Amino acid sequence: MTTDTTDYLLDTNACIGIREIIKGANPKNPAKVDQLSKLKARWSSVPKERLFMSIITWGELRYGAEKSNHPSAAKARLDAVRQAVQILRMDDSTGEHYGAIRKHLEQHGETIGGNDLWIAAHGRAQSCKVVTNNLREFSRVPQLHCEDWTA
């Protein structure tokens, strides 16, 4: 039996999905039900010590909670996500990867969102697979390994 030693960096959309699972969301859209079911199955199969989110993702999640109509409840749900997914700190190598990735994208006439660029740099610097349902955006980043747990 092989033990998976891959570290996973969950992007904001993946963490929002986990928040919905923890919350016990019951979406009406069958496609969304299927996506959450697949996400839950994959998330449950990975040891907790292999699951991370970037501090950038944590900031995006907190921003969403702050602007919520019910910020206290939203923050409480985020605390549950925080218990399930560790925050991966950044070091100097993240900045180095950011600069190289941004230069590469500009040279090739490509762009990705600012926060996604930081998440990609963080994942690549730490040799993590980035978990996202936004493969179209993240696939533009060379040498970044990604998975979509909702597909």
Where are these regions (language model features)?
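Generic structural signal for small/hydrophobic residues in well-ordered secondary structure
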Residues: 11-12, 61, 98, 123, ...
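Alpha-helix capping/helix-boundary segments
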Residues: 14, 94, 119, 136-137
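Nucleotide phosphate-binding site architecture
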Residues: 15-16, 59-62, 88, 139, ...
